[in-house]
């Protein structure tokens, strides 16, 4: 083997090791990811939001990551009364990502309606070594707001394929996850099929929602500040 060939092989192996050492989430404290969601029918903007990694606490076995998202209307004014918090745990050995879905529900309800919700903690997982055909565990969460109960069911979670995706923020190697998401409760019911593109070290890059088989909204990563 020539010296040049050896260097190329070493580089490829290093890149491969780095990829395996990353999960499908951004763990760089201070990083900001800006997303834009649009209605597919007419191209109008539904919202924009910037997610900021505000805290990364490393215990040795895992990292606990806190993100804070600020949503704005198309005119730039705040969409909610406060930011939406999300807690994520990344296993340092396997790099599996676990998102506290129930906690995010509680924060969303507080931001949108100013109400306190009792949700507990329910996690949605995405392994770092996920491959096309893999089926992931379903997620069931519930929020109690006074006498009212809101349910969230995320089922039929499966990895569809690998795909290289180009968005305004750049070009990303992704896995595509399909999920059936049902939200139900007084005054709020939504039944969608979601396709989400995840890239290692970043998180999701694109998020499409289908209603009755028809693409309804598409959300893309517009920029990322590291």
Which functions belong to the PLM regions below?
Residues 6-10:
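Sec-dependent N-terminal signal peptides
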Residues 14-18:
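N-terminal signal peptide c-region/cleavage motif recognized by signal peptidases
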Residues 1-5:
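Positively charged n-region of N-terminal signal peptides that target proteins for export
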Residues 22-86, 90-91, 140-226:
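Acidic, serine/threonine-rich low-complexity disordered tracts
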């Amino acid at each position: 083997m020539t010296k040049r060939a050896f260097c190329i092989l070493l580089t490829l192996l290093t890149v491969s090791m780095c990829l395996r050492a990353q999960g499908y989430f951004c763990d760089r404290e201070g990083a900001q990811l800006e997303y834009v969601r649009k209605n597919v029918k007419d191209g109008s903007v539904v919202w924009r939001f910037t997610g900021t990694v505000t805290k990364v606490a490393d215990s040795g076995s895992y990292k606990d990551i806190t993100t804070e998202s600020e949503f704005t209307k198309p005119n730039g004014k705040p969409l909610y009364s406060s930011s939406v918090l999300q807690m994520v745990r990344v296993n340092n050995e396997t790099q599996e990502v676990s998102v506290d879905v129930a906690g995010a529900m509680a924060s969303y309800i507080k931001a949108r309606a100013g109400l306190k919700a009792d949700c507990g903690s329910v996690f949605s997982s995405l392994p770092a070594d996920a491959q096309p055909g893999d089926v992931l565990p379903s997620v069931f969460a519930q929020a109690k707001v006074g006498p009212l109960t809101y349910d969230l069911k995320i089922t039929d979670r499966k990895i569809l394929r690998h795909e290289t995706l180009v968005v305004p923020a750049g070009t990303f190697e992704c896995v595509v996850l399909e999920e059936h998401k049902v939200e139900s409760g007084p005054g709020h019911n939504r039944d969608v099929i979601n396709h989400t593109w995840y890239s290692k070290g970043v998180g999701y890059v694109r998020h499409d929602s289908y209603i009755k088989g028809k693409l309804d909204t598409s959300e893309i990563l517009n920029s990322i500040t590291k």
